[in-house]
From Swiss-Prot:
Signal peptide: none annotated. NDH-1 shuttles electrons from NADH, via FMN and iron-sulfur (Fe-S) centers, to quinones in the respiratory chain. The immediate electron acceptor for the enzyme in this species is believed to be ubiquinone. Couples the redox reaction to proton translocation (for every two electrons transferred, four hydrogen ions are translocated across the cytoplasmic membrane), and thus conserves the redox energy in a proton gradient. This subunit may bind ubiquinone. It comes from Phenylobacterium zucineum (strain HLK1). GO terms for molecular function: NADH dehydrogenase activity; oxidoreductase activity, acting on NAD(P)H, quinone or similar compound as acceptor; quinone binding. This is NADH-quinone oxidoreductase subunit H. The gene is nuoH. Belongs to the complex I subunit 1 family.
Amino acid sequence: MMDPAATSFWATPVGWTLVTAGQILAVMIWILLSLAFLLLADRKIWAGVQMRKGPNVVGPFGLLQSFADFLKFVLKEIVIPSGADKTVFLLAPLISFTLAFAAWAVIPLAPGWVVSDINVGILYLFAISSLGVYGIIMGGWASNSKYPFLGSLRSAAQMVSYEVSIGFIIITVILLAGSMNLQQIVASQTGGFWNWYVFGGPGGLAKLPLLLVMVPMAVIFFISGLAETNRPPFDLPEAESELVAGYQVEYSSTPYLLFMIGEYANIVLICAMTTILFFGGWSAPFPSDFTDSWAPTAASFYYFMWFFLKVIFFFFLVSMAKAIVPRYRYDQLMRLGWKVFLPFSLVCVALIAAWRVFGPAAAA
């Protein structure tokens, strides 16, 4: 039995701070380790599409390649252009890195496995993602070079354009779930894949008309997430054939590494958000009442594995898009966001709102 004095210590502000710091550290370590192997998988998939082997020298099957790259970046010299604003130049990648990891504070990995279970989790995520553009703009401006500056301007326009559509899509999920708490959104989709919001959410046969709305919304959300994170085929802010490396042209060593880690953390975050909002989060595709007899920790690991498998699946789609889809022109990118996704998502918000007011759920 736990000592009452120890129990009372963890209830104090100091104990709570230590517990929260431990949770944050555990989540950061999991994200960094996941990124190391997901980045390797990304390179392997790209190589496989091109009929190459990919990284296969460092460690068995190349599994340690990402760790070798980490050491390479950390041990290199930090080169700062002579005309750059040194303070802003070094602050920009730190902001991007910090915001990318701060967003994970509200992501539920399993029942109860969340650093901060706030009731406005979706609003928090939307705010954090909106702030991410500042690091890119600061990096492009502080470099005092035309290519980084053009890349940062492209990134700002691109992120703002697609955030509007993402916001409307999130509203449709909020209307169906009746909550902005991410754990409650996942909990409302338990009971089988037919209760996931991509299929209209819980409600039996009465919710079948919602399929015509929610399936396209899930697809648009995922595509908009690619544009939001500057991933191919929407990697115009760092298009090699036009801008060399975009806003990252003048960066090297650790600052470049921070930008890259922040970018991939955001990519995995989009995969996690797609999983949570439309594909049931940590819930299994089929009812899993047998976990009721399990120990809480074992059940949590079971649900966490489902969450992680779904995230890996969407990351695979991201990697395949990079390998097989050609890059959009800038005018095509803007047209897709403003003339296709935005009007469609706005109409879908109106349809979901009407369903909530006049549909079977309202009549019940």
